[in-house]
């Protein structure tokens, strides 16, 4: 028997389907469902009088015979590869299948089997994204990790040892002893973690020993002396051991100008932090490197997007983070040289063009660890309002722009740092690090954050209430954040050398350790939807930025979505 329902009722019951559009929070961005893997009239949904019951949507098939551990029903997936409606099956902490869930005994085309061993998570009316990756972390305090995961970040990559002066300024975990201690500390957190060693040395031995100890990359920072010799040596070590190099270049141009740094790269791949320059780098033209094939350019979030307040707040941030003294004129000049409205405005447009590939935080060191996702979508909104639809869009939606921007904090940092086999997208075989959002709160406040297929953080009300929803409702840690579950649902990333040398066993790490790979054979072309290579020019006197001859200029935003209306309580 057929029963016909109108589109609105269907969307309210099972979530949007092909042709329906969803607004992202209070932005001017609208995504449209491109494909629906579910079957009309045969959808699965959990609840009293609903479908997932024994003999109906739930089969008697055991876990051993193919039933999944968790099914997320009727979710709207937003990822770099597409925007689709589907059920998602999770098994052994990994994404098992994206498709149609149910009982194959009575339903057709079922590729996700629901059985007695299967838990259900309602995705109707929700947006499902991959957990975010923040690839510019100063590990200044462990509380950052709570803030990050509560915002939808599930992987953090960077360096540090706590609030030491070096860590406050540079993302480096220097030396074997510190590396071992940070790997041990990582055991406590429901977060995938990878550490960067100090990359500043003109001789390779001190760098190689850090890679052997377990870091997944090396960080070159001007506060430690980012000279052409140090750059060359660091990249040579990285090539030998297959780890990534991140760089904060020479703001003062003491050891050479941007041309000297590019020459020192020798066409070897490198991740350039805060490539616009306010966070540090050759003044005023480090932004030029985003046009180089071997450069993987990222932004940090304080300059995202360009607003009327951006310039004013940066000077104070910079003085603190880089241990500068307002009473020393040279220190003030150093700070002022890094803050340029022209390059910050250009950064907005370069992100929209796909010339900047990654957005990260620079946590507590001129960056906000809980705002990577918010700032990314605010930038996308600002560009939608100021520049209109992208030329590559098909249909009356913002799908291409949404896919481009989500790639900046998911798949692209994963590829850059050699962890894309494990995390960074919603694809079969990857760790089930997933985030569910109510569309009205998209990008601002997640509803549920899963780590390795288990709920790690979620919006939760009063624990003494008779139901889960009474106020105060806010993000709280759930069971994947406690006890032995942490080790089974989160990863520690190490170098291939450290993995083969048995460093995880030597340190008696319980958390699953995996090795990074393929960090040296990639390029800008590897960056999903963010691989543009414009010919860059910067006027050294006016700071005007041109890409392929076009002047990049935009007005600062005076008001933004995803802001104060979401944080009244």
UniProtKB/Swiss-Prot annotation:
Residues annotated as binding substrate: 221
Pathway entry: Nitrogen metabolism; urea degradation; CO(2) and NH(3) from urea (urease route): step 1/1
InterPro entries reported for this sequence: Amidohydro-rel, Metal-dep_hydrolase_composite, Metal_Hydrolase, Urease_alpha_N_dom, Urease_alpha_subunit, Urease_AS, Urease_asu, Urease_asu_c
Protein name listed in UniProt: Urease subunit alpha
Active site: 322 (proton donor)
Keyword list, A-Z: Cytoplasm, Hydrolase, Metal-binding, Nickel
Cited NCBIfam families: PRK13206.1, PRK13207.1, urease_alph
Modified-residue entries (N6-carboxylysine), positions: 219
Subcellular location: Cytoplasm
Gene3D superfamilies linked: Metal-dependent hydrolases, Urease, subunit C, domain 1
Signal peptide from the UniProt entry: none
Native organism: Microcystis aeruginosa (strain NIES-843 / IAM M-2473)
Catalytic activity: urea + 2 H2O + H(+) = hydrogencarbonate + 2 NH4(+)
GO molecular function, one term: urease activity
PANTHER family: UREASE (PTHR43440:SF1)
Binding-site list for Ni(2+) 2: 219, 248, 274
Summary of subunit composition and partner proteins: Heterotrimer of UreA (gamma), UreB (beta) and UreC (alpha) subunits. Three heterotrimers associate to form the active enzyme.
């Amino acid at each position: 028997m057929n029963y016909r329902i109108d589109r609105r009722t269907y969307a309210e019951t099972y979530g949007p389907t092909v042709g329906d559009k969803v607004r992202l929070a209070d932005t001017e961005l609208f995504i449209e469902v491109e494909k629906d893997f579910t079957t009309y009239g045969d959808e699965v949904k959990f609840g009293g009088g609903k479908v997932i019951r024994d003999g109906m949507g739930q089969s008697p098939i055991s876990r051993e015979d193919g039933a999944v551990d968790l099914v997320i029903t009727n979710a709207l997936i937003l990822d770099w590869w597409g925007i689709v409606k589907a059920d998602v099956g999770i098994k052994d902490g990994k994404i098992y299948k994206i498709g149609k869930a149910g009982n194959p005994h009575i339903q057709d085309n079922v590729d996700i089997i629901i059985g007695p061993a299967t838990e259900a998570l309602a995705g109707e009316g929700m947006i499902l994204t991959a957990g975010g990756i923040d690839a510019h972390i100063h590990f200044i305090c462990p509380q950052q990790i709570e803030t990050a995961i509560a915002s939808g970040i599930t992987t953090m990559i960077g360096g540090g040892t706590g609030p030491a002066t070096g860590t406050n300024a540079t993302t480096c975990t220097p030396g074997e002893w510190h590396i071992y201690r940070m790997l041990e500390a990582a055991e406590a957190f429901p977060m995938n973690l990878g550490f960067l060693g100090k990359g500043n040395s003109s001789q390779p031995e001190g760098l190689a020993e850090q890679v052997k100890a377990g870091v997944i990359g090396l960080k070159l920072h001007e506060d430690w002396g980012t000279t052409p010799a140090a750059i060359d040596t660091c990249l040579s070590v990285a090539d030998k051991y297959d780890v990534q190099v991140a760089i904060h270049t020479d703001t003062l141009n003491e050891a050479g100008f941007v041309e000297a740094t590019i020459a020192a790269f020798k066409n070897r791949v490198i991740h350039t932090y805060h490539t616009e320059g306010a966070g540090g780098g050759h003044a005023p033209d480090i932004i030029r490197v985003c046009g180089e094939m071997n450069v993987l350019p990222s932004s940090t979030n304080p300059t995202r997007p360009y607003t009327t307040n951006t310039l004013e707040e940066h000077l104070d941030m910079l003085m603190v983070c880089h241990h500068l003294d307002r009473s020393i004129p040279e220190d003030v000049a150093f700070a002022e040289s890094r803050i340029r409205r022209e390059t910050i405005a250009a950064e907005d447009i370069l992100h929209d063009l796909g010339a900047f590939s990654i957005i990260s935080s620079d946590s507590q060191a001129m960056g906000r660890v809980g705002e990577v996702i918010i700032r990314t979508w605010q930038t996308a909104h600002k560009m939608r309002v100021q520049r209109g639809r992208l030329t590559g869009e098909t249909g009356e939606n913002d799908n291409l722009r949404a896919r481009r921007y989500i790639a900046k904090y998911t798949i692209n940092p994963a590829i850059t740092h050699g962890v894309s086999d494990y995390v960074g997208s919603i694809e079969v075989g990857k760790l089930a690090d997933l985030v569910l959002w109510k569309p009205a709160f998209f990008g601002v406040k997640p509803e549920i954050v899963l780590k390795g297929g288990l709920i790690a953080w979620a919006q939760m009300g009063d624990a003494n209430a008779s139901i889960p929803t009474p106020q105060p409702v806010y993000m709280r840690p759930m069971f994947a954040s406690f006890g032995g579950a942490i080790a089974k649902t989160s990863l520690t990333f190490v170098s291939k050398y450290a993995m083969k040398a048995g460093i995880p066993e030597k340190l008696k790490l319980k958390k699953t350790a995996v090795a990074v790979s393929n960090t040296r054979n990639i390029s800008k072309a590897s960056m999903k939807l963010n691989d543009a290579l414009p010919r860059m020019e910067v006027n050294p006197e006016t700071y005007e930025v041109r890409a392929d001859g076009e002047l990049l200029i935009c007005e600062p935003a005076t008001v933004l979505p995803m802001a104060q209306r979401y944080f009244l309580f």
